[in-house]
Structures are given as C-alpha cells and as structure tokens.
C-alpha cells in the first residue's frame, strides 16, 4: 500500500487512507470509518473515488464489504474495473500486487454498474459482494487475454 500511496502522492492524486477490516487484522480501528465518511462526502459532491476491493491480510481477489457499504450509504453505483499491461512484475504478496512496467501493451476494461439499495439487508449485501467479486475476477481474466493477444 505504501508504494502506491507514495507514487500517487507524487502524481498529486488526493488520497484517503484507512484500513478496511481491523478485526480481520487483529488490530483496533485504523481510520476506516473516517475514510468511509470522507468518500461519501466526495461522492455526494459529484466526484468519483476508487480503491481495491480486497482487504489485507487477504487472501487476495476476494472482495470485502467496503465498496458495498459505500454504495449503500452514498447511493452511488460501483463500477468494477480491471487494468493490466503486458509488461509487468507480480509480487509474491498476499494480494499478488502487480507493478506495471513501461514499453508494453495496456488495457482497461469495466463491467456493468452494481447498485446497492439503501435498505439492503445483510443477505443482499453479501449477494452484491459476491457479484462484485465475480465481476472483478471475470474482468481480470478478460483484460489479461486482451494484452496477451498477438
């Protein structure tokens, strides 16, 4: 996370920091609630936010509830997005963090918006979380095929 945060800061991208699931990490609250409030304010102001759907300590590629809760509270849809490049290095970290390198082919692909009703039940939240996870994993497979074509 620090590598991305430092890179984005140098590119003058506004960052909102906060841990998504402190109980899973065995730690106390690490700014997740404040980050959620900040993102809701930004969305209600007509702007967009982005973040990864999986949460430390993993496993990677499994969506947490963060995006679903944000969509429920903000009234904004989730747009699943996957991006990759043909020239990349994959780390052996829990999330298989990937550093995209120059001089390769790149692609970005997005899926259908996912709407979460403000009165969504726990069961509906879990269904939307599964929908997001499946969509992101399918998009990742598709975008990798795009850059691997000769």
Question: Could you say what each language-model-derived stretch is?
Answer:
Residues 59-122:
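A cross-family acyltransferase "interaction/gating" segment
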Residues 19, 53-55, 112:
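Short, structured patches in soluble enzyme cores that scaffold and shape functional sites
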Residues 22-24, 30-36, 86:
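Active-site and donor-binding regions of nucleotide-sugar-utilizing enzymes
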Residues 1-29, 74:
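Catalytic core of membrane glycerolipid acyltransferases/transacylases, capturing the structured
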Residues 35-70, 74:
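Catalytic-site beta-strand/loop segments enriched in glycine and acidic/polar residues
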Residues 8, 19, 32-43, 66, ...:
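Hydrophobic, well-ordered secondary-structure segments
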Residues 42-44, 126-150:
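Membrane-interfacial terminal anchoring regions of lipid-handling membrane enzymes
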């Amino acid at each position: 996370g620090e590598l991305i945060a430092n890179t984005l800061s140098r590119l003058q991208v506004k960052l909102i920091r906060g841990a998504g699931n402190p109980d899973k990490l065995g730690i106390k609250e690490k700014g997740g609630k404040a980050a959620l409030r900040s993102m809701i304010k930004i969305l209600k102001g007509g702007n967009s936010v982005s973040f990864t759907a999986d949460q430390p300590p993993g496993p990677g590629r499994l969506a947490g509830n963060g995006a679903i809760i944000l969509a429920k509270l903000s009234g904004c849809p989730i747009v699943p997005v996957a991006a990759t490049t043909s020239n990349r290095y994959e780390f052996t970290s829990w999330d298989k963090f990937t550093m995209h390198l120059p001089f390769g082919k790149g692609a970005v692909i997005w899926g259908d918006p996912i709407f979460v009703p403000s009165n969504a039940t726990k069961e509906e939240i879990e269904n939307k979380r599964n929908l997001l996870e499946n969509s992101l994993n399918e998009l990742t497979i598709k975008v990798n095929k795009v850059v691997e074509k000769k």
